[in-house]
Curated annotation (Swiss-Prot):
Induction: Is up-regulated when the bacterium is grown on t4LHyp or t3LHyp as sole carbon source. The active site is at 91 (proton acceptor). Its EC number is 4.2.1.77. One of its GO terms (molecular function) is 4-hydroxyproline epimerase activity. Substrate binds at residues 92-93, 250, 255-256. Catalyzes the dehydration of trans-3-hydroxy-L-proline (t3LHyp) to Delta(1)-pyrroline-2-carboxylate (Pyr2C). Is likely involved in a degradation pathway that converts t3LHyp to L-proline, which allows B.cereus to grow on t3LHyp as a sole carbon source. Displays no proline racemase activity. Belongs to the proline racemase family. This is Trans-3-hydroxy-L-proline dehydratase. It comes from Bacillus cereus (strain ATCC 14579 / DSM 31 / CCUG 7414 / JCM 2152 / NBRC 15305 / NCIMB 9373 / NCTC 2599 / NRRL B-3711). Keywords: Lyase.
Length: 334
């Protein structure tokens, strides 16, 4: 066997949504800010994303992360996230998993019963809190970037279907739609149809309008489509599944999507400040969310959302690349 590259990772999941944290084999990432570092990765390190996200080492639903030095003077560290299509601007389930893995493996030093972390992401500063007992993390909460409704009640016409979506930002831009518009339930049996509609809705919106953050040009485009449904469990508020990137299914309630959903509910007076919002996902996992404070992003009313969940480590891996392998960059099915 010939080996040209070796990568080490720690894998975890949050309500079934994977996160592969790359702990070894990453070259220097250049850039002063996390957005600049993201742009550098997109241009120079996309081979690394393909190797570790694609089959045979990953799969269509894999998600990844690189922990970087902080970009700002007061942050503890930075994060860069990746998926089947490229490099994302923020990832809520990723924050929950990174903090859990960091504490439970001794990567992060902690004191007391609750630890605060300041994290630089391409979307902005995120503050996370871990509640733990010894080396076991019980839950992680994060205060996300200011989240807001970009456009309400956007009319959509696809084939014979006419409906409306809300476009909201929660670290990335999402279109929010009721699954009942298509006669679908957020369940495994309807997932293929939901994926199909997710792709169509994303393509339609991006063909009709430019969606761009008012303060940061690097934050633009529809990242995902959130399909909302009635919950299965009595303690949940809503059920959802998010289709993002290239038809990728978020198994978790989606942290940035939950933040966007909190913003839409608050804007429609369906969620009050301090009220607990329980977001259920397709695997029946749950995130808790709430509005911590009200703020503004340029001319948009915004909220600072808090999202809480937990994660579990699934493995410690060492991946190699053999230069003789015609599939050493990987491939993607799905």
């Amino acid at each position: 066997m010939k080996v040209s590259k070796i990568y080490t990772t720690i894998d975890a999941h949050v309500a079934g949504e994977p996160l592969r944290i790359i702990t070894g084999g990453v070259p220097e990432i250049k850039g002063e800010t996390q957005l600049e570092r993201r742009a550098y990765c997109m241009e120079h390190l996309d081979y690394l994303r393909e190797i570790l996200m694609y089959e045979p080492r990953g799969h269509h639903g894999m998600y990844g992360c690189i922990i970087t030095p902080p970009a700002s003077a007061h942050a503890d560290f930075g994060v860069l996230f990746m998926h089947n299509e490229g490099w994302s601007t923020m990832c809520g389930h990723g924050i929950i998993a990174v903090i859990t893995v960091g504490i439970e493996t001794g990567m992060f030093e902690v004191t007391g019963e609750k630890q605060k972390f300041i994290i630089d992401s391409p979307a902005g500063e995120v503050i996370a809190y871990a509640t733990y007992s010894g080396s076991e993390v019980e839950s992680v909460s994060f205060e996300n970037v200011p989240s807001f409704v970009y456009k309400k009640d956007v009319p959509i016409k696809i084939d014979s279907y006419e409906f409306q979506v809300d476009i909201a930002f929660g670290g990335a831009f999402y279109a929010v739609v009721d699954s009942k518009e298509f006669g679908l339930k957020v369940d495994f049996k309807d997932l293929s149809a939901i994926q199909m509609w997710g792709g169509k809705i994303k393509h339609y919106i991006e063909s009709k309008m430019e969606v761009k953050h008012p303060l940061e040009e690097g934050l633009k485009g529809i990242y995902g489509v959130i399909f909302s449904d009635d919950p299965k469990e009595k303690d949940a508020t809503l059920r959802n599944v998010t289709i993002f990137a290239d038809g990728q299914v978020d198994r978790s309630p989606c942290g940035t999507g939950t933040s966007a959903r909190i913003a839409t509910l608050f804007a429609k007076d369906a969620l009050q400040k301090g009220e607990i919002f329980v977001h259920e996902c397709i695997t029946d996992g749950k995130f808790e969310g709430e509005v911590l404070s009200v703020t503004a992003v340029h001319t948009y009313e915004a909220v600072v959302p808090k999202v809480t969940g937990n994660a579990f480590i699934t493995g410690f891996h060492q991946f190699v690349v053999d230069p003789r392998d015609d599939l050493n960059r990987g491939f993607l099915l799905g």
